Amino acid sequence: MHTFLRSTALVVAGLSARALASIGPVTDFHIVNAAVSPDGFSRQAVLAEGVFPGPLIAGNKGDNFQINVIDELTNATMLKTTTIHWHGFFQHGTNWADGPAFINQCPIASGDSFLYNFQVPDQAGTFWYHSHLSTQYCDGLRGPFVVYDPADPYLDQYDVDDDSTVITLADWYHTAARLGSPFPAADTTLINGLGRCGEAGCPVSDLAVISVTKGKRYRFRLVSISCDSFFTFSIDGHSLNVIEVDATNHQPLTVDELTIYAGQRYSFILTADQDVDNYWIRANPGIGITTGFAGGINSAILRYDGADVVEPTTTQATSPVVLSESNLAPLTNAAAPGLPEVGGVDLALNFNLTFDGPSLKFQINGVTFVPPTVPVLLQILSGAQSAADLLPSGSVYALPSNATIELSLPAGALGGPHPFHLHGHTFSVVRPAGSTTYNYVNPVQRDVVSIGNTGDNVTIRFDTNNPGPWFLHCHIDWHLEAGFAVVFAEDIPDVASINPVPQDWSNLCPIYNALDASDH
């Protein structure tokens, strides 16, 4: 079990501790406002079940998840409506349950509820969930989600894989999203919901403690629930044997540290084979937060059973083996779709990604994404049959069915590196950041990819086997709010027949549209 050391004076009703007991696959899910102080600084937040991060939702491969989201939000300084995105799930046949506001649904009104009811027949691994309405998840509505596989091919290589081996990394903001600047700097790195602020005047807050027993092997599931910051992650004195990337099994790859971007996940096996002691867990942010580890910032503690209850004195590896995406290879079905050559696809798209300084907006092919007032899915169900008929104009791309798509995402837009996420799919990264070569044989497969820095031209491939409108966007939430997104309307003619919508979904828009703007 995780052990959290804390001063009760800094905790309001225990709300900043992550719930240790997982919930699901069938559950009510209350979204509430409450005060939390994960770094000793108290603020009002938007919380799932009253805790940050939200509780672990868990189930098994093949489960039917029925998550009844109950909106009890009342704080007018933050959004009162909400939606939830279940990040990484294909939602085949349930596009209406994917969650992005005004793409797949209207928001849930305060005082109302909505049942997300979806099957997970062929996926397992590490996922997460978060609000997908404006920048609401930066105010706290985010948490981990795990689907266990009883036939996991790595099952015999670890002894422990449970609630206690999930590690969340978050950036934390002392100011509510709607009250701050468009591109705020985070105040604190939180590991499993606890951390220390690096600014002058911040209290010395307690750190998360992850307990291990010498001799045991642990499958840790590392989840970036970040709004912006990416993190360089390591555990002093221990190597990380990576076996899963964004809910896809990969060939084992042993490293000392890895960089994880907003929305990404890794599973790694850690063998507790060092002396019984305390070891620093490090998550150094790339942007927005005070970097380094002075005073225990950006840190947590790996504590062996029997070790003294003290902070570690360990040091980082001086020449670490660093994870490179180019070295990751899927365990099965490794080949990229299409022909193993440049242009060997049915449709190739090249996006021009830019930032417009005067407007403080991002653009894809010259267009800033502005959410429509009618969800894209509802537009399709109401008869729109081409991209030209769909709003927002210039931001919807129609994709044919049963086709292989290649998408190039050249870096260079201000504020990078930008992590891009495609809903409804995993994709093959045939050209990762930092590489000038293409790998069609066994490229990493994932659902969030960093597009790197100026000069990079990250290229991905996927098959259109999932009818519906699917969001593609930068997972830095401030950048999404500034228009860094498009919608892929996949196989428009089959959307309605493949994705029958429940009546409660149809009721969402009339209820939302009747709200006063102050209740949004």
Swiss-Prot record:
It catalyses: 4 hydroquinone + O2 = 4 benzosemiquinone + 2 H2O. Cu cation 2 binds at H87, H130, H475. Disulfide bonds join C106-C509, C138-C227. Glycans are attached at N75, N352, N402. Binds 4 Cu cations per monomer. Its main location: secreted. It is found in: Secreted. Its cofactor is Cu cation. Keywords: Copper, Disulfide bond, Glycoprotein, Lignin degradation, Metal-binding, Oxidoreductase, Repeat, Secreted, Signal. It is an enzyme of class 1 (oxidoreductase). Cu cation 3 binds at H132, H423, H473. The keyword Disulfide bond applies. PROSITE patterns: MULTICOPPER_OXIDASE1. Belongs to the multicopper oxidase family. This is Laccase. It comes from Phlebia radiata. The lineage of its organism: Eukaryota, Fungi, Dikarya, Basidiomycota, Agaricomycotina.
